[in-house]
């Protein structure tokens, strides 16, 4: 009886410890923030996640006000938990879309909308 209980407890504890390692990367901060308004011109995007990100296999794309899509180059030398990229922005409404590949192989994706104003 005690052996089974102990085995069950060990299984539960090991499963709980392994769960975070299998979880997908979660976006914890971004520049711009969702819904933000930023000035026109050169802009540095920063997306920070709760785990290490594979910069080489992750993707960022920017949907411009006219509907065109620009695939952004991710800075290879960025922090291991961040995706960083530069773009020139004109006035209008944009959507930044990401596909972040966690170092463990899991992919998470999402998007955020923001506007650019002539300041």
Predicted regions and their residues:
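Bacterial N-terminal signal peptides that target proteins for export
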Residues: 1-12
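N-terminal signal peptide c-region/cleavage motif recognized by signal peptidases
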Residues: 18-20
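Boundary of Sec targeting at the N-terminus
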Residues: 23-24
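Acidic, low-complexity Ser/Thr/Gly/Pro-rich repeat segments typical of extracellular/periplasmic
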Residues: 27, 36-38, 44-119
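Surface-exposed, proline-enriched loop/turn segments that connect beta strands in immunoglobulin-like
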Residues: 32-33
């Amino acid at each position: 009886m005690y052996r089974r209980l102990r085995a069950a407890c060990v299984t539960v504890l090991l499963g709980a410890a392994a769960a975070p390692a299998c979880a997908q990367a979660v976006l914890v901060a971004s520049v711009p923030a969702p819904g933000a308004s930023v000035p026109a011109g050169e802009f540095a995007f920063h997306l920070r996640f709760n785990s290490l990100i594979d910069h080489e296999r992750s993707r960022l794309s920017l949907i411009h006000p006219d509907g065109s899509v620009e695939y952004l180059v991710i800075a290879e030398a960025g922090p291991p938990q961040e995706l960083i990229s530069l773009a020139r922005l004109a006035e209008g409404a944009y959507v930044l879309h990401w596909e972040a590949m966690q170092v463990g192989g899991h992919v998470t994706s999402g998007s955020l909308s923001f506007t650019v104003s002539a300041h």
